Design a protein with these regions (language model features):
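Aromatic-rich carbohydrate-recognition surfaces in CAZymes
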Residues: 215-334, 347-350, 354, 468-490, ...
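Extended glycan-interaction surfaces of carbohydrate-active proteins
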Residues: 177-215, 239-260, 309-345, 385-469, ...
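Structured, solvent-exposed acidic/aromatic patches
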Residues: 343-348, 370
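Short acidic alpha-helix initiation/capping motifs at coil-to-helix transition points
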Residues: 159-170, 181, 217-219, 355, ...
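A short small-residue
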Residues: 336-339, 360, 476
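Extended, well-ordered alpha-helical scaffold segments
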Residues: 150-164, 179-186, 233-246, 286-304, ...
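Terminal accessory carbohydrate-recognition/targeting modules of carbohydrate-active enzymes
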Residues: 1-181, 212, 483, 545-552, ...
Length: 567
């Protein structure tokens, strides 16, 4: 069994809903430290649990997963740190090593027998209990709660808890002969860490983009998570999609972000039907399909009424004046597409609508709703025709947004303009011209494809959606290329995506939010709405986020596509 074994600062360490009651409203997540074997926990006042001293040659790691760390020196017993229960980390040490807690703020330390207590006077308390080579570190909202949980933790076997955690990879990992077995296992590790248990309005398990710094649910992130999770647990994948419409309003609107008792007032790309159809291919659960169909019918109807500014079937995102996030609704927050102040008939929004409408027709036929299917077919044709009539530049051989205020194409060379392939709205000759752009080294054929902005565009850079590579775009564009018969090109892009993501996992121990299209700069050195900040510090959050959810789920799906025979 091959396990993730690369240590890297910023890796997630958290309790998963797959193992019990992981609540978003009472979470105690951590990240691996960069300067020692330790975990920094994100309570109100930050705390760090570290193993000290760990000096000398030959320290190796057998497992570095999102809830289990196994490590040690040659000739010694292996040491471990396991997230065994909600708010409880247990472990064992060897040699002269011992656990230590460091608190990054006001704290009233105490000792009660074998237990060290850290009360930060804000309602959060941690306790570290030790017995021989074992230790237990617990978080609570009172001194008594933390002490009790830590002492209960000493009764647990770190070795048995380690075996329980790592059995997940035995069940769901791939064979040792898979060329990317370790990357596959790393994807599983991140995926596991993203899951919260049912809570409040959420009747099912639900997911979050990265646990830290995002701790809420996002619409299209959840769909991308489901696409990966269908290979692990297709029933769970259905639940991740169900969670998306928990906060749907009576008028059909679905918020882009939600949590227990919390919703936003903007939406996100309509990809629900597409995602539900991918999951349905695994489950053949007609009741789930009907549920998704009914909720999404209302959502698409809301989009048609609320996000269309012309008589044509072209769709417009909500935008703001925030220069770093003009279009959060599109998911492409700071793309130069939105540098213009006026509204755009957006190529991506229109294509997401076309693609979801097309999948609604497939769902309707499967459910025996022939009249609905015919209606969705007609709607799809309307979007297809309007996209090709209004958003195509014959001179450039490319699709662009339409600046509705100026009445002309807004010529920003963005990866969003390849989404007509994904939506299936391209005539074959135009699909061929798009493929040419993807093979042009001066434009989109970068070392690590596909840049979010073409190299020849004056806005091309290294800041988030202004040049770096995003795996969700690669996934959708490659699906579109295959639809149009460009199989070799799609496979080449997927192979490069996997190869370079694996390279950076081996170097840095994490799966990143986005990557450098030249593959020369570490993703941690790329701008994220500003210059990068080192060391990694999520309270500042000006770095590519580490152990990112959809990067992991879609990488796993790409590996399944590239190596279908490897299980």
């Amino acid at each position: 069994m091959i396990l993730p074994d690369r240590w890297g600062q910023g890796q997630l360490f958290a309790f998963s809903a797959l193992d019990g009651r992981a609540l978003a409203g009472d979470d105690f997540p951590g990240m691996l430290c960069g300067d020692r074997v330790g975990v920094r926990f994100f309570s109100h006042v930050r705390r760090e649990l570290a193993i000290v001293p760990l000096s000398g040659p030959g320290l190796t790691f057998d497992a570095v997963t999102s809830d289990c760390l196994v490590f040690g020196f040659p000739g010694q017993e292996r040491m471990r740190m396991v997230y065994a229960r909600p708010h409880l980390i247990i472990g064992s040490v060897a040699g002269c090593a011992m656990p230590a807690v460091f608190v990054e703020g006001p704290c009233r330390p105490e000792r009660d027998g074998d237990t060290e207590i850290h009360d930060t006077l804000d309602g959060d308390v941690t306790a570290l209990a030790r017995c021989g080579d074992r230790f237990a570190f617990a978080f609570g909202h009172s001194r008594e709660e933390a002490i009790l949980l830590a002492r209960e933790g000493l009764a647990l076997s770190p070795e048995e808890e380690q075996a329980r955690k790592l059995s997940f990879y035995a069940r769901h990992g791939v064979g040792d002969d898979h060329p990317y077995a370790r990357l596959y296992a790393k994807c599983l590790s991140v995926m596991k860490s993203q899951l919260y248990a049912p809570e409040g309005e959420f009747a099912t398990v639900w997911s979050t983009p990265d646990r830290l710094p995002h701790q809420h649910m996002w619409l299209w992130d959840s769909i991308f998570h489901a696409v990966g999770f269908r290979h692990v647990d297709a029933t769970l994948a259905q639940d991740l999609i169900r969670a998306v419409w928990v906060h749907q309003r009576p008028d059909g609107f679905i918020p882009h972000m939600a949590d227990v008792g919390l919703t936003s007032d903007i939406t996100q790309p309509p990809v629900i039907a597409w995602g539900a159809w991918q999951v349905y291919a695994f489950t053949r659960d007609d009741s789930f399909l009907r549920e998704a169909y009914e909720h999404n019918a209302r959502f698409l109807a809301w989009c048609r009424v609320s996000r269309r500014l012309t008589a044509r079937e072209l769709y417009t995102w909500n935008t703001t004046s925030d220069v770093n996030c003009r279009c959060d609704e599109s998911g492409m927050d700071n793309s130069p597409r939105f540098d213009v102040p006026g509204p755009l008939a957006a190529i991506d929004f229109s294509c997401y609508m076309a693609n979801d409408v097309r999948h609604m027709a497939l769902m309707a036929r499967t459910l025996g709703l022939e009249e609905d299917a015919a209606r969705y077919d007609g709607w799809f044709r309307q979007i297809r025709d309007d996209v090709n009539a209004a958003l195509w530049s014959e001179e450039d051989g490319f699709y662009f947004d339409l600046d509705l205020s100026a009445g002309r194409l807004h010529r920003v060379w963005s990866a969003a303009s390849f989404l007509p392939l994904f939506a299936g709205v391209c005539p074959p000759d135009r699909a061929g011209r798009l493929a040419e752009h993807l093979q042009d080294p001066a434009s989109f054929a970068t070392v690590f494809p596909i840049p979010s902005i073409s190299r020849k565009d004056p806005t091309f850079g290294t800041d988030m959606w202004r040049g770096p590579v995003w795996l969700n775009m690669n996934h959708m564009i490659c699906e579109g290329l295959r639809r149009y018969g460009c199989t070799a090109l799609a496979e080449d892009i997927l192979r490069k995506t996997v190869r370079f993501a694996d390279q950076w996992y081996r170097d840095d121990g994490v799966i990143y939010e986005f990557y450098d299209s030249s593959n020369l700069r570490a993703p941690s050195r790329l701008n994220r709405k500003g210059a990068p900040f080192e060391p990694y510090h999520i309270d500042v959050r000006l770095q590519a986020i580490r152990d990112y959810g959809w990067s992991s789920t879609l990488l796993l799906d790409m590996l399944r596509q590239l190596y279908p025979e490897k299980r």
